Each structure stands twice: as structure tokens, then as C-alpha cells.
């Protein structure tokens, strides 16, 4: 959903693509609940063909925050988890022609300009791949192609570490090659009007985040740091309850916020009777529970600040999956007015740990060892 940070990022990117600011390079921080993926998808849909945007409340909210209709842009996506280190990947040119290419810069060139894009990068002006990293001036020329057709240029980059870790393990020289590519690419994006680059460098697979993976990640972060604006986290702690509500419940069941209050008041009556600290908070406590309803605010706080920091949960949607598993089982027996830690317990009179809790124990054990 359009969180404050997501709306701010979308506004900045769209205005850059309209030629109205100089924020050319944006980097996404890891987010809770798959916010990274939703952010990249949102950006693509808003500018790929804005004339055909559906009339949905979320779309209108984005447009209202931007202050104008998004400009039409050519979007190129470097999805490194789909780019095989040996075979490459199939990509589509602006004219709809498919071709399998191996090098990241070739994948970018084909999406932006087809055969002409490959020719721009090739030493002999051929529609073929080159093995070495293209220089900044060539990438600048490539990024300028959509502008000649009256379009903005949006480059989306995802899962860089997935590819980089594997490629560097095979060929050590690719460590410098990738650094150079991203250095040249980010510098080129800054120089091209109506061009924006939005990147996520992390790997979903925790196995890519070993010592070598962390070294590569740090080096790439340094490269992006030189050109990017402040990093953006589309989903922050204050958004967690809304993310969970939208993931786990039907829109109609959580649409009427006024209906939350009687349940919160009733729950707080029991809580304040035994919890002096909450009782002292008065109206502030009521607002906190309202914002988090139907989840106990302490539960969402722990899930966000503790469990999402663990590597195995951090780079997957593990928290959401485990939480959903717990809710499905607890719905059969838990009569509590709020969704709290009890949902992770096993069914009463059933021995052992619940399936959800077993998953959490496995993750915790992995972190410790």
C-alpha cells in the first residue's frame, strides 16, 4: 500500500523522469514484508504506460502525491536473480524482439534500444555483445536513446548480490568489472536528463551473504554511495500493522477503522487492570493499540525490530510466512481479543512446539551457530 516513504520515493522518481529534479540514483534498503519488490513493481507500472493506469485508490493516491500524471518512460529491469552466470537471460527489445544475452550491460542495452543499443556499446558498431565493461560515455549515450523518442529512462536493478557472488566465485576479475560497471552506470544516469536508476543490492538467498558476499556488497554500496540520494526504506516500523492487515485479511474486514475502537477499549480494560504501566499511558496507549489492531503492538514491535534483523528472515519473507502459519492454526482455538504471542503456541493439550514456532527455533539456531 502507499506508505509515506513509498509515496515520497515514487514522487521523487517520477519528477526526475519528468525532468523536474536531479535525484537520479536511488537505493532501496531492505524492507519488511516484501516492500522492495512492491516498490520496483509500482514504479514500473506507473511510468511504463501511464495512459492505461487503472482507476484504483492506490494509483490515485500516488498521482495526487506526485502532483501530476506520470510521464511515459522506457523501463529496463536488471533482475540479477534471473541472469544466469553462464547462459544469461532472454530479454525483449522495445520493438518486441526477444534475444538471449549474457552480459548485464547487454541486457540493459537491448531493453533500452534493441540492436541499436548493442551497437552503441560495441567497438565495431555491431549488434553483438562485448565482454568488457563499457565506459561511462557509452552508457550515457545508451541512456539517452529513449529521450530522443520523448520518453524518460527508468532503470530498475534488483538482487545484484545474487549474481555478483556467483560470478566472482567463478571469475575473480568480475569483482572489479562489476564495480566499474555500476560506477559508470550511476555516473551516466546522473548526466542524462529524465533518467533515474533505482537499485536494490541485497540478495534474497542468505547463502550469498557469506564473507565474500558481504565484501562484494560493501564494495557495491560504496559505488552507489558516491552518486545516490539518501537510501529509502519504503516500509518502516509505523507501517507494519497496516502491511500485516492487508496481507492477512480481506479489505472489507479492515476497511472501517472506527469499528476497531470498541474492541480496543474492551481489550485495554483487561490489560490496564493488571498492567500499571499501560494504565498510566491513558489515551496514548489507546492510540497505540488502535494503530496496531488487531495485532498487539508489542508483537509487531518484536517482529519488526528483532526477527527481521536475522539474516534468514531478513532476506526472505520468512516472518510473513511464519506468522500466517501461526494465525491459521491459532484461529481454531485462540479466543484472545488481540493477536499476540500466544498465536505461536501449540494447540492446547497438544504436545510439542507448533509448526510456526519450530520454524522460528530453526532460524534462531542457525543465527547462533
What are these regions (language model features)?
Residues 64-89, 94, 98, 102-103, ...:
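Conserved P-loop NTPase catalytic core
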Residues 153, 312-369:
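Helicase motor interdomain insertion/brace
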Residues 19-21, 50-54, 145-150, 170-171, ...:
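Secondary-structure transition/capping motifs at alpha-helix termini
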Residues 163-176, 208-210:
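Conserved ATPase-coupling elements of RecA-like P-loop NTPase cores
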Residues 9, 101-104, 108, 174-185:
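Well-ordered, non-membrane alpha-helical segments in soluble/globular domains
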Residues 1-34, 41, 45-47, 219, ...:
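Walker A/P-loop-proximal flanking segment of P-loop NTPase domains
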Residues 4-6, 26-31, 38-127, 133, ...:
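P-loop NTPase motor core
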Residues 118-157, 167-168, 176, 185-188, ...:
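Mid-core helix/loop region of P-loop NTP-binding domains shared across ATPases and GTPases
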